[in-house]
Amino acid sequence: MKVICEVSNKHCHLTEETSKKSGLNLTKLKDISQPGQWVSKEYYSDGTEDFRVIMPCRSEDQFELSLTDWIKRFGRDTEPKWKRNKEAGYVVTLRHLHISDKQAKEFGLKDGDFVSIRKEGIRAGQLDKVLVRISPNFDFRVHLDTDEANALYIKNGEEVDLIVT
């Protein structure tokens, strides 16, 4: 089974309050694959870095970093806060599969399960421990950060093999 990969750089999800306090008038740059979500033209600054904003607003402010970005910001000796759901603060997102409940049932998957993806080619390899996230409206996509995508030379929108065991 093939699945499309989407590669994300550092970005943030803001609360309504933070969005208003920032003084930014967030305008849509483009829709993204998950229904109802979009990327803003504007960037939010935390005083150190600028983050692309993903909307709509959430209940907690969240700043998603690659492992490389985490190490640059906090150092190698600071254990990353691994994101599984919608934890607040600075997090390193776990690679994950978005899948609808109907598709998940067809594959025998439950929310929180893990699958793998495989990429062929000059940088062939496999990424295990891809967290399964299920919601009725999810589009079937794997989300990777730039570190993971670069390791296997996966381009945004490229298809890879999904391995369900």
Residue map of PLM features:
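Short, charged beta-turn/beta-strand-edge "cap" motif at the junction between a beta-strand
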Residues: 120-124, 165
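Catalytic domains of riboflavin
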Residues: 1
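Short beta-strand-centered segments at strand-helix junctions
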Residues: 5-118, 128-159
